Amino acid sequence: MIKVTIFLLLSIFSFNLYGLELNEKVSIKYGAEQGVGSADSNTKLCSDILKYLYMDEYLSEGDKATFEKKCHNVIGNIRNTFSNKNTIKEGNEFLMSILHMKSLYGNNNNNNAGSESDVTLKSLYLSLKGSQNTEGESEVPSDDEINKTIMNFVKFNKYLLDNSNDIKKVHDFLVLTSQSNENLLPNKEKLFEQIVDQIKYFDEYFFASGGKIKVKKGYLKYNFLDIYKQPVCSAYLHLCSRYYESVSIYIRLKKVFNGIPAFLDKNCRKVKGEEFKKLMDMELKHNHIVERFDKYIISDDLYYVNMKVFDLKNVDKIQVSKIDDINNLNIYEHKETMHLSAKNLSRYIDIKKELNDEKAYKQLMSAIRKYVTTLTKADSDITYFVKQLDDEEIERFLIDLNFFLYNGFLRITEDKHLINADDVSPSYINLYRSNNIVALYILKTQYEENKLSEYRAHKFYRRKRVSNITNDMIKKDFTQTNALTNLPNLDNKKTTEYYLKEYENFVENFQPDLHDIMKLQLFFTMAFKDCNVNQNFTETSKKLWFDLLYAYDKFGWFYIHPNEVINSINKTDFVRHVLVSRNFLLKNNDQLTFLETQVAKIVEIINLSLEVDKSPDSLDFSIPMNFFNHKNGYHVMNDDKLKLLTSYEYIDSIANNYFFLSEYKNDVFRTGNNFKLYFNLPNIYSLAYQLFNELAININVITNVPLKKYLKYNASYAYFTLMNMIGKNHDIYSKGSRFVYASYILGLVFFIESHIDIARLKPKDFFFMKQSLPIIDHVYHKDLKTLKKNCTLLTDFMKINKNSQNYSLTHTEEMIKILGLLTVTLWAKEGKKSVYYDDDVSLYRKLMVSCVFNGGETIQEKLANNIEKSCDISQYGIKSKNLKDMIDINLSIHKWNPAEIEKLAYSFVLSCKMQKLMYKPMNVEKLPLEDYYKLSLAPDMVKTYHCYKLGKQAAELLESIILKKKFVRFRVTDAIDVYDFFYIKKVLSSRIKKEYNEFLQDKRAFEKKELETILNNSPFSEEQTMKLINSYECHWFTSYENFRILWMHASSNLGTGTYLKNFFSELWQNIRFLFKSKLKIRDMEYFSGDISQMNLLDYYSPMVHSESHCQEKMQVLFITLRDSKEENRSEIAQKVKSAYYQCKLDYYKNHHSDFIHRIHPNDFLNNKVYVLKQPYYLMSNVPLNNPKKVSRLFVTEGTLEYLLLDKINIPECFGPCTKLHFNKVVIKESKQRIYDMTINNALVPEIQPYNRRKYMTIYINEAYIKNIVSDALTSEEIKRHDIQKGNIKICMGKSTYLTEPILTEEHFNLTHKPVYDFSSVKHNLKVFHMKNEHLVSEDPNDDCFINYPLATINLDISDPYKEISEDLIKNLYILKSS
């Protein structure tokens, strides 16, 4: 798994870019000489813009004249509106378009530094802004303010141009893995300290002894009734709730039991109150029968009490004798005695035997039954059930109630071997599970709001509605402002008091005696015995929890309003809804508690990310623009700042749910009293999904319908259950803690899985692009409409306050929105990669995530609106109806990555603004060959759109030829002809068949005619035009895979079948011939001439040759084993696999430095040597005594072909290799190729135009940064911070060229230990401050003569020499045939 840290991003935004120095003096007086409305100043400014761009190669004289003419009017309009707050965006975007155009096409080194006549971005900004000032701006901005504004332009432009996202996976959470960031460390450490620190509340009351948790001596007389006022209760909300549930049950049932004697005095002649008290007395006395319990499990054995004794430790002991048969009890029979602890014994009462009077027994039971009915008379159904109870059931009620009040835990005699302490602690759920139904009847009718049975509960719920709340009423509660989001917040004091009020009601007017205090301490201990540091609520998560509970009870805020839930349930279905809810809560109480506590941790991380948003590492857009307007991101991002990571990337990083990089999963629930803080969290979506399955199965059982098909039509069952989880559960049989966080997560997961995740119904839906990117035909419009519909459903559902009146967002809603976005992202994720960059994520999920983050607007809609707002698309002949098609096509080219297409779209807008002023319009829909030069200058989105149309026409031509030749006469040469025709034609043909036949008659003449047409109609010189032609290639004709997709599309249109499949399979295997001659690395890097004599290693050659070598040996081995009568056929595969690994190891060991793996002088002479841009990445593989820690890796053309054809992960490519990861090696003394893109270094000849130069950054793993301590030129100290800011360069001279193998004997016998610290030995990892670059030696042999900017990265990619690539093995056969 690849983990890219923030350091990569920091390097992206280094400020020393494109020669745009920001330290020049402000030589122009602010507003002087540039009077607004002055025609001369407008003309001068337009002229200055041309000087600044220096685009001579891309602008003809006519284009320059056109620009100056159009520019004059545009400048006048912008100057007049630059002071208007509503129209200032136009001016800013115009400046951005100038900078962006210069970056793409201009010469960035044309100015003489220090000249007073220099035209800089700053001078253009000052001139354009003129003497007008925006509202609230000082008369003359300071130099620092101006520089800051220009810097923001530069940073944003670099962000748009950055292509490092090609290797991007998801960033580990920005704060929690940025251990070296001085600004973020305090916040991160504070969070951990808060979490760990709260265990002190537990330590204040408890201590561990003999594996048991006990109350400290200082609290032995404390009754714990008002513990809700203490921090321990708010730090562990769910545990405190469990405690007070036990307390309330105890107090209420004790009151019920204490009322029995007085009732008997009036209603029972044979057994009066005092006799009843003696009968039920639990004090152990001589002749009493007792039962024994151990860890709350009651033994089947009974004992007879002989006497009380005291041991030396003053511990109560009871001398007892075991009873063999309770029905034949003889107290005078001599039995063997034993001494048992009084704490583990309880009196066994058989009321019938104790009374020894049948009439008295029946009269007593009748009186108790009558007493219970007086308590349950509020509901006739319950009263009727009580009257039907027989005497034995009434007796059991009395016995169990008496046992509980005396011992403090429930008496369970069935399935005893399955119970534990959590099962016997007093709770409503445990009373129900232990069949204490009569006690629940009494508690329900005496103390609950809903006193009716489930058969009549609908009457209660119909009456129990949330009052209609207006926004004005809500504002009265939101009287505070959150410091992080600046949004209205609920009064913390009010929400806390509201929550604690319920606890106060439990304990008011109760005066506990010493016996009660012991029980209260037991309840407190039982509730907190499993307390651990991973389950607490810090101040932030507790505050939001209180807010959500208050908002639900007072306003009905939830995904589904409680009134709507009740209205959706028919009277006849109400009992079934109650039963579904009850069954789910009874079964999943623990799992819900677990989910609750883990979401609380996620809330902390979200809050921490909001704090990070205040960090200095941001793109400041207090400068108004239309870019990156996320409608559903963090609220703070919608004001004036955009982070280096967008709001999506923040949440995507949080969605990984890991504090640190530990992959080990720790059980943090019911693990006993554990003080260890685990640095990873479970995936809350997975936890909620397991609960969703339980809920869905519950619904299915009750409704008896196919689960997956009709789940959403029975959603009322789920919402009613959720209502009982977050609200006050009025079903006493499943009553328990309120699961606020769990309700929100489970509610959203249920909606996603039942309404949004269409894969549940049609697994293949919206996976249509998985194997066939990019799109060729638009057959998906209907599906995309479904996506839009579902996205709207989801975004509407996620709003917890659905009041349609004008209303400002609150902090509570913001936090739930973020939690909802996190949940949606987790739904889409297939691993720890970013959703947008993960090929395993379906198109549907990628686009759904993007749509939700944009507030229900699809990425296509958003970009189309933004483009039309800022760009006149008619410049390229594009109409509004085709704009979304163009966006879809570009999306498909970029693997449907919304982040990439957004950057591409804004690059398009900026280019469009300038090109509108520079060039004549073109019509990309019907582009004639005469205008082809315009396509080369067009934005990438326009080129891709044209390429799509060209590919579609190529596929249609191919289909027609195949059909015409009836398959059997179609040859590979026909495919080659189609390819060559479009490669030469370059534009759409209106007479495709006629021109194709003309091409077949004389290919050279056709190519010459097409080329001459382009050259003759271009306003540029022949040399410039050829450069334009060569600078752009259509996607379909650049790689084997791309061209193959075109044929895949053709085959799918022609039908299916074995013959057709085989036909195209053979075609694809041979199609590679087309590309061997087309392979071209665009970037070239200059090296000194003596490199050809250095006997360099062809680094990845052994890997390639070992595959071929071992495959041949394995074929022989397989045949031998297959034909051997002694071999077990089931073991052949494993034997071949083991032999394959051994063969590879032997080859590396014996042949990795063979002559065939060296680069020869002829390879350089024939221009067939390439170098990976990045040096050897796995530096820890290099032995400590080897000084070559930094090594440039060179490969020959043959090795390069294999690496590009295979999808194996190469560390130096940060994944699978593409042409962008290599440079072509060019000897300085060879013939100059001045129009190729050149990597800028000290060997580049002066003749090379600066605008054709490319800047290259060297990345090394951050694990090796500790070895960089000083400047190689001045010996001054170098800090990690200097590298993060992009102020360091790395020396990449001849000492880095790899001439000897890195692998040693230790690598082969697996005894090599990775080397991360080599600071104590001599090594070639040399760096220096950019400010000291003038001190670099002019000797080409000096290590630092060649140098590049340095940045850090953190990628975990294993050494490809340790892996077998199936794709490579298959491709070897294809290439071998050539």
UniProtKB/Swiss-Prot annotation:
Residues 1-19 form the signal peptide. Disulfide bonds join 46-71, 233-240, 791-851, 871-912, 947-1034. Disruption phenotype: Conditional knockdown reduces parasite growth and proliferation. Late-ring stage parasites have irregular shape and trophozoites exhibit an abnormal stunted phenotype rather than progressing to mature trophozoites. Parasites that transition to schizonts harbor significantly lower numbers of merozoites per schizont. Delayed parasite maturation. No obvious differences in general schizont morphology or in the ability of the erythrocyte to burst. Merozoite clumping after egress. Reduced capacity of merozoites to invade an erythrocyte. It is a single-pass membrane protein; Peripheral membrane protein. Its main location: host cell. Component of the RhopH complex. RhopH complex is composed of CLAG3.1/CLAG3.2, RhopH2 and RhopH3 with a 1:1:1 subunit stoichiometry. Interacts with CLAG3.1/CLAG3.2. This is High molecular weight rhoptry protein 2. It comes from Plasmodium falciparum (isolate 3D7).
